[in-house]
């Protein structure tokens, strides 16, 4: 049997890598092909199709790169039609994967999609297209069960979140400190401006300016920044030089270890906010994007919140600073509240534990039981 896996961004690559590892251990005769990334490559998925070709963010970033994205998509589809996999699993990236899934489904190939599109936040009418697009959906957030049933979509199962199973309920902080060789005695603050190059460009400057303000107020702070690529590294180093901050360390990768040892984190909204929840790290969420993208974002958004901690708890657990609200001053103010208020941090940790438990299932086993039944 042959399975093809399609991913479009780093978070999907992490999910794919975990699933590939499980398949190779428990279903060694399954052949795996598809799009690769840094994590899935380590699990043996070598491919000429790489997620680096799809790393754009925002409506207008997509428009500016549309020709190259469409070329990549069409080449990948032709590759799959030639390979004729028994199963196609699209992981997230719905605007990319839905096209692939629909074309393969028309050819009689069994199609699955992992990660329900955020239909509960915007474009709820997409649910009507699910049946024509793929055969089965794997939902990873528990609040989606009620929403999908309400809209009478039945071909799905809730499988929990892959990271909730990978990350212990009580992570080993000392182990992460040893891995990072960090012995700092003061407060540690994780800074996560995003993983895609466009995210880093939009979010780094305001973040570093906020650290200048925080460093003036608090002594002995250490800021840690996980860097995911050489392109991101060069841009972040440039901004670091411009702001002349001395108490920031850039670390290649290790975002999980950084979140684990951080007293608080300041995060550009995205999957990293959920990772912070699973590591029980209190956070401030901010999000910078172009004015045009922000206009469309506000027009389409139906959810009251944008960050996963708030969406999953259905309340304002963490501060959200969006677009023009995401100033260095506002970020520093919200971060200061977390630093100063121990009881608030403890309450957040309690709430995060509850979210973690609700999403901690045998995800890969549940997926494979459905794929290979």
Feature map (PLM): residue ranges:
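Nucleotide-activated sugar donor-binding and catalytic core shared by glycosyltransferases
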Residues: 1-373
């Amino acid at each position: 049997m042959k399975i093809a896996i399609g991913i479009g961004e780093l978070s999907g690559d992490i999910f794919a890598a975990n699933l590939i590892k499980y398949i190779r251990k428990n279903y060694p005769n399954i052949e795996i092909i598809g799009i690769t990334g840094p994590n899935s490559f380590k699990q043996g998925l070598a491919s000429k199709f790489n997620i680096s070709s799809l790393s754009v963010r925002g409506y207008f970033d997509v428009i500016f790169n549309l020709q190259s994205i469409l070329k990549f998509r069409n080449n990948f589809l032709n590759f799959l039609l030639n390979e004729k996999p028994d199963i196609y699993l699209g992981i997230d990236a719905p605007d990319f994967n839905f096209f692939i899934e629909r074309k393969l489904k028309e050819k009689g190939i069994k199609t699955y999609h992992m990660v329900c599109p955020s239909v509960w936040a915007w474009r709820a009418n997409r649910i009507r297209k699910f049946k024509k697009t793929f055969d089965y959906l794997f939902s990873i957030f528990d609040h989606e069960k009620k929403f999908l049933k309400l809209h009478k979509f039945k071909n799905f199962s809730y499988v929990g979140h892959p990271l909730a199973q990978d990350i212990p309920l009580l992570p080993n902080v000392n182990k992460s400190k040893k891995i990072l060789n960090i012995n700092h005695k003061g407060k540690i603050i994780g800074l996560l401006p995003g993983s895609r190059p466009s995210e880093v460009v939009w979010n780094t400057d305001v973040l570093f300016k906020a650290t200048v303000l925080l460093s003036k107020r608090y002594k002995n702070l250490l800021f840690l920044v996980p860097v995911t690529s050489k392109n991101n590294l060069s841009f972040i180093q440039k901004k670091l030089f411009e702001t002349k901050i001395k108490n920031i360390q850039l670390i290649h990768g290790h975002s999980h270890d950084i979140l684990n040892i951080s007293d608080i984190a300041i995060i550009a909204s995205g999957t990293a906010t959920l990772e912070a929840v699973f590591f029980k790290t209190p956070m401030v969420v901010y999000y910078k994007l172009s004015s045009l993208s922000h206009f469309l974002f506000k027009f389409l958004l139906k959810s009251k919140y944008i960050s996963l901690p708030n969406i999953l708890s259905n309340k304002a657990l963490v501060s959200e600073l969006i677009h023009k609200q995401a100033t260095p001053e506002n970020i520093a103010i919200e971060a200061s509240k977390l630093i100063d208020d121990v009881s608030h941090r403890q309450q957040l940790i309690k709430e995060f534990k509850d979210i973690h438990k609700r999403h901690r299932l045998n995800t890969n086993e549940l997926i494979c039981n459905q794929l290979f039944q």
